């Protein structure tokens, strides 16, 4: 089976870091500072959302993640995205995931709130196992994975122009 890891970003609050630790899966953290990270294996990206809420989607994807994904080698290894957010921010809940999914043409696999629940951990572990099993069959089977949007506050994303 092909190698698969988790690549994630977590600010100094460490919310995403704590979630990733609960997964017990091989992981690499995108640095908070400007140090570059380059990956040479397939990965699932776990990313928090930094939008202000309402219709303000500006800044939803952390700058460090944008810098990481601006590297073509890093982009080509991404097999899917999982995002976190805060439902208090309404329409921008976990918005970084759909943005990255659309730009990279990879599946949005799951969204969770804040630190995630035990159910979120189990779902992400199952997604990881399923994707790892299917990675050798290339992108064709990755696209067949079911996208999960589990939070009742999640609404379809509106098109915003920048």
Swiss-Prot record:
GO molecular function: FMN binding
Lineage of source species: Bacteria, Bacillati, Bacillota, Bacilli, Lactobacillales
Top-level taxon of origin: Bacteria
Role, per record: Probably involved in ribonucleotide reductase function.
Pfam family, one: Flavodoxin_NdrI
Family the entry assigns: Belongs to the NrdI family.
InterPro entries: Flavoprotein-like_sf (IPR029039), RNR_Ib_NrdI_bac (IPR020852), RNR_NrdI (IPR004465)
Name of the molecule in the record: Protein NrdI
GO biological process, one term: protein modification process
Gene3D superfamilies referenced in this protein's UniProt entry, alphabetically: 3.40.50.360
């Amino acid at each position: 089976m092909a190698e698969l890891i988790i690549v994630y970003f977590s600010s100094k609050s460490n919310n995403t870091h704590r979630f990733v630790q609960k997964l017990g899966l091989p992981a690499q953290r995108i640095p908070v500072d400007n140090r570059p990270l380059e990956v040479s294996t397939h990965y699932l990206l776990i990313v928090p959302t930094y939008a202000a809420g309402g219709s303000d989607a500006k800044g939803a994807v952390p700058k460090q993640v944008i810098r990481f994904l601006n590297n073509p080698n890093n982009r080509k290894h991404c097999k899917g995205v999982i995002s976190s957010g805060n439902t208090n921010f309404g329409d921008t809940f976990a918005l970084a995931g759909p943005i990255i999914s659309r730009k990279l043409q990879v599946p949005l696999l799951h969204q969770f709130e804040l630190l995630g629940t035990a159910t979120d951990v189990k779902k992400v572990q199952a997604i990881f196992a399923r994707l790892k099993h299917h990675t050798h069959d290339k992108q064709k089977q990755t696209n067949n994975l079911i996208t999960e949007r589990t939070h009742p506050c999640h609404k379809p994303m509106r098109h915003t122009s920048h």
